């Protein structure tokens, strides 16, 4: 970790963004979302006991203890001046794209597809779907040497019309408790990606609106 990272949590990777802004306050949920996508500040095992007891954590730099650092809390009413708390990303994913006419009316279709992954010991990351389509995002290194078995399992269990696989994808997590109360955040995110000619493959936003996961090629 750089000195800046040891001092406090930052909003972006210093390997990508010059002089990233510091995070003054972050919730445990926000930190977990960012850590899951590769942000390395504190290991989950290190914060689990104090999180369970609702004890806040203050990260400071031992070389500059007078600085405020970053507070990690269970919840906060403090309104951040930033809509987005942090951004993290991870490479090495692939998507298994499945199509079948009238898929939406077939009871248990999603379960059958995921069963093929379970039988081969592969966990999934995200499962966006449409009326006749379903996509399963998985770690590429876990999937590629079991690809034929998984595809055969999907055909056997779900009988799809088509299966297509895309590799070398990345997932970006945009995390922030302020996104829920701010209109147009997603639009600005996608405008920034389009401005850099980045092809968006998947969008996944939970009902909590705490984060937006974007799959890119």
Regions found by a protein language model. Name each.
Residues 7, 14-65:
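Polyanion-binding loop/helix "lid" in catalytic or ligand-binding cores
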Residues 11-13, 203:
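Non-heme iron-sulfur electron-transfer modules
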Residues 1-10:
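Single conserved hydrophobic/aromatic residue that forms the stacking wall/gate
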Residues 68-217:
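A conserved regulatory-domain signal marking ACT and ACT-like small-molecule sensing domains
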Residues 3, 57-59, 125, 201:
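Short hydrophobic alpha-helical runs that function as membrane-insertion/retention elements
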């Amino acid at each position: 970790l750089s000195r800046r990272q040891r001092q406090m949590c930052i909003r972006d990777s210093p390997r990508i963004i010059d002089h990233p802004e510091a995070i003054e306050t972050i919730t445990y949920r926000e930190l977990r979302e960012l850590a899951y996508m590769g942000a390395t500040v504190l290991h989950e095992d290190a914060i689990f006991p104090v999180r369970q007891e609702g004890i806040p954590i203050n990260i400071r730099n031992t070389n500059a203890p007078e600085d405020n650092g970053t507070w990690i809390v269970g919840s906060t009413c403090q309104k951040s001046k930033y809509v987005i708390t942090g951004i993290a990303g991870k490479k090495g994913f692939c998507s298994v794209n499945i199509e079948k006419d009238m898929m939406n009316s077939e009871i248990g279709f999603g379960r059958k597809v995921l069963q093929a992954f379970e039988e081969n010991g592969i966990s999934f990351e995200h499962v966006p779907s449409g009326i006749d389509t379903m996509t399963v995002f998985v770690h590429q290194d876990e999937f590629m040497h079991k690809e034929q078995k998984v595809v055969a399992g999907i055909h056997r269990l779900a009988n799809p019309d088509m299966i297509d696989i895309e590799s070398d994808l990345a997932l970006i997590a945009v995390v922030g408790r302020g996104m829920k109360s701010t209109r147009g955040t997603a639009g600005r995110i996608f405008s920034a990606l389009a401005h850099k000619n980045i092809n968006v493959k998947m969008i996944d936003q939970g009902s909590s609106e705490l984060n937006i996961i974007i799959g890119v090629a």
